[in-house]
């Protein structure tokens, strides 16, 4: 992932593709109540660009992103209230890889499987959510592959950003602070060593 590690940065193109998958597919059932389209401006998109994206997705620039599916319909369809995706990438260990794997985990169920939908990466293998993705489902303007594998990576990256948009800044600032502290410690050590060397000579 481009946003991992020292010097990591959000991949704007990937997050934009992930936005497409999230708004065209995920929002059919899931909401993103702690995310607003306007938040994309923090990545460097202009207000006009974000306004256009919001309009295409029938969203309002400064309003939380909510699903049109109400709780009664969720319970009737899935037997549960569908989870909000705003902080899903933080709610699971190694969340971004968990989300990607989950999207890729829909395979043919073994003969002895008992349940609704089989997913080899979901705990217990039985997941209420049907496979949401298929090749060619979302059209990308940048020429990226329109495959389940690409959709899965893109929506995972988008949800990682949605859950913690300040991750990259905090990660890089923290690393530079540690480097600064290490240099100061080294400088202090060398200074003290020089002082004591002079003291011993006296």
Where do the protein language model's features map onto the residues?
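Electrostatic cytochrome c docking/interface patches
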Residues: 1-20, 31-42, 50, 143, ...
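Second-shell loop/turn segments in exported
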Residues: 5-8, 84-89, 139-145
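Extracytoplasmic/secreted proteins, especially bacterial periplasmic and envelope-associated proteins
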Residues: 13, 17, 21, 84, ...
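Bilobed periplasmic-binding protein/Venus flytrap-like ligand-binding cleft at the lobe interface
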Residues: 21-22, 99-107, 158-162
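The canonical Cys-X-X-Cys-His
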Residues: 22-33, 155
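Membrane-proximal low-complexity regions enriched in glycine and acidic/polar residues
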Residues: 48-126
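Extended, hydrophilic extramembrane loops/domains of integral membrane proteins
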Residues: 129-164, 168
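Juxtamembrane interface at the cytosolic side of transmembrane helices
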Residues: 170-173, 181-202
């Amino acid at each position: 992932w481009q946003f991992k590690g020292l010097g990591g940065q959000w991949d704007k193109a990937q997050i934009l593709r992930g936005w497409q998958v999230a708004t065209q597919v995920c929002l059919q059932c899931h909401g993103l109540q702690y995310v607003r389209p306007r938040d994309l401006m923090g990545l460097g998109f202009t207000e006009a660009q974000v306004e256009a994206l919001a309009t295409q997705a029938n969203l309002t620039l400064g309003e939380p992103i909510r699903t049109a599916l109400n709780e009664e319909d969720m319970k009737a369809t899935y037997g549960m209230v569908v989870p909000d995706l705003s902080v899903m990438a933080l709610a699971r260990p190694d969340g971004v890889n968990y989300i990607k794997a989950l999207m890729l985990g829909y395979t043919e169920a073994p003969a002895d499987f008992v349940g609704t939908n089989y997913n080899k990466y979901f705990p217990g293998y039985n997941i209420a959510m049907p496979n949401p993705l298929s090749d060619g489902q979302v059209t990308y303007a940048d020429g990226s592959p329109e495959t389940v594998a690409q959709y899965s990576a893109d929506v995972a990256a988008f949800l990682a950003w949605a859950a913690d948009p300040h991750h990259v800044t905090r990660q890089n600032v923290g690393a530079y602070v540690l480097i600064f502290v290490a240099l100061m410690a080294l400088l202090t050590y060398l200074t003290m060593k020089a002082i004591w060397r002079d003291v011993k000579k006296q």
